[in-house]
Amino acid sequence: MIRVAIDLMGGDRAPGEILEGARLFSRKDCKLFLVGTKEALANATGFEKVEVSDFLPMDVKPTEILRRKTSSMYIGLKLLKEGAVDVFISAGNTGALLAGATFILGRIHGVERPALAVPVPSLNGFTVLIDAGANVRSRPEHLVDFAVMGLSYAKVLGREKPSIGLLNVGEEETKGDETTRETYELLKRYFPDFFIGNVEGHDLNTGKADVVVTEGFSGNVAMKTMEGTAKMILDTLKSEVKKAGFVQKIGALLMKKVFSSLKKALDPRSYGGAFILGVNGLVVKAHGSSDRLAIQNALEVARVGAEMKIVESIEGEIKRVRDSGADR
């Protein structure tokens, strides 16, 4: 049985929507541990309860987690560290979760910086975007680590031979700044069978690459832009259907199944959360504005990650890369 701990106090809509998401998820092969204050846990029946006296607000400084050791986020990470649970989820402050995960769990041997990995919708199912916001700036060797972790994650998700692309302002080798050009050469050296070269922003959702590597600043901007575009498309469709005449509404009704599939593909809530990869434990960062549906999906992401042993897979992939080429 997979044991999942969730921070009941993290997120803009905590604790109410977090609790409702946990109720929606409910699976026989998973045991849920809710980490929260006495008040938040009062109506949480049918779950394992972990009572805490403190929680971190969304605008907290990232390093505060290291001082507030009775907070829900800190305690959840400690449960993971001690082996009491298999995976921890929080919709709380990203910086605090990253700092806490790195400090409490430690990094996987060979990884200098953890990264956020998000499977974004694409024409071939998904594209793993890494880093989606953990590191604003990164060195070329860090981006190679991200490629290793993204490759491993894509394999876990079912890609037998995932292709890797480097996010850039053009496809030519000479494009981009010094960091990007150096990263290009390293990826070509370490991943000759996987690296397909530079990809651009418009390639993220086309399936051109199964893994897209970038530093956290541009990765986060890309992810948020996709979320905004998806919202605009869905809201526009909804608005136009409401304004349409009788015949058009009949047509829309006949296409209800198509619209439902489109909504599912574009809705950011459908991918639930991002893994913080590179730490010695499985941690899922849910969106700060997560509602119950997003939390339900984040729990499913966590379950699959634990079942597929992502951390162990990354450890093996890093060893393979280290053994296959020149010193880093």
Swiss-Prot record:
It comes from the Bacteria. SUPFAM superfamilies: Isocitrate/Isopropylmalate dehydrogenase-like. Its EC number is 2.3.1.274. Keywords: Cytoplasm, Lipid biosynthesis, Lipid metabolism, Phospholipid biosynthesis, Phospholipid metabolism, Transferase. GO terms for biological process: fatty acid biosynthetic process; phospholipid biosynthetic process. It catalyses: a fatty acyl-[ACP] + phosphate = an acyl phosphate + holo-[ACP]. It holds the Pfam family FA_synthesis. InterPro entries: FA_synthesis (IPR003664), Phospholipid_synth_PlsX-like (IPR012281). Homodimer. Probably interacts with PlsY. This is Phosphate acyltransferase. The gene is plsX.
